[in-house]
A protein has these predicted regions:
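A surface/extracellular/periplasmic glyco- and lipid-processing/surface-interacting theme
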Residues: 1-201
Length: 201
């Protein structure tokens, strides 16, 4: 199931957001109401493969909330072009509260401000692949990749990668020496963006 050819008509564009000037990548939506019938009509598998039954990331212990090895970080600013996001650390709750364009971003059902234990900023190579403006993102990462792991009041510069030629493989995060890092348990936000568009304070 993918949105490039939109097989099954599961994906669309929010015309209101387009009219408001949002960048194309911020206007897509997925119509989940059509998913069950599409899965059934295509005879798609609904059980997890064995290699997907474990955790997606290497985690710290249940009671551990560790600060990344690096600098202090209580504020993250990410410039996405037409939109910007910010994350401000709430030390009492040990989460980063999300803002969008200077306003608190809230859950549509609960009204609560979005909060994340972990924030990743990954800087893959990004290019425009067609006249519509679709982006080509290099998901592979590797030893020359750049990223940042923010959690518990700190930020650490990292390397990230996926298994070569396997877009379905999990992301892996490493310190600058190449050792895989464990992350804190909790909600995680992953930003993919052009290089040098984020600041950490």
């Amino acid at each position: 199931i993918e949105g490039i050819t939109n097989t099954g008509g599961l994906f669309g564009r929010d015309q209101d957001r387009l009219n408001q000037g949002y960048a194309l990548e911020h206007t897509g939506y997925f119509d989940g109401t059509k998913l069950p019938s599409y899965i059934e009509s295509q005879g798609l598998r609904t059980d997890l493969k064995e290699d997907k039954k474990g955790p997606a990331f290497l985690f710290n212990g249940l009671e551990e909330q560790l600060k990344p090895e690096g600098s202090d970080c209580t504020n993250v600013q990410i410039n996405f072009g037409a939109q910007s996001s910010a994350f401000t650390y709430d030390a009492g709750r040990k989460v980063y509260l999300k803002q969008i364009n200077g306003q608190a971003q809230t859950d549509g059902k609960t009204g609560n401000q979005l909060a994340f234990t972990n924030v990743f900023v990954l800087e893959p190579d990004i290019s425009v692949r067609d006249s519509v403006g679709h982006k080509e993102i290099d998901w592979d990462g590797g030893p020359d990749s750049t990223g940042y792991y923010v959690s518990n009041g700190g930020v650490q510069k990292i390397i990230w990668s996926k298994d070569p030629n396997n877009e379905n493989s999990y992301l892996r995060f490493y310190d600058q020496s190449g050792q895989e890092i464990a992350i804190n348990r909790g909600k995680t936000y992953i930003a993919l963006n052009y290089k040098n568009q984020a600041t950490f304070q």
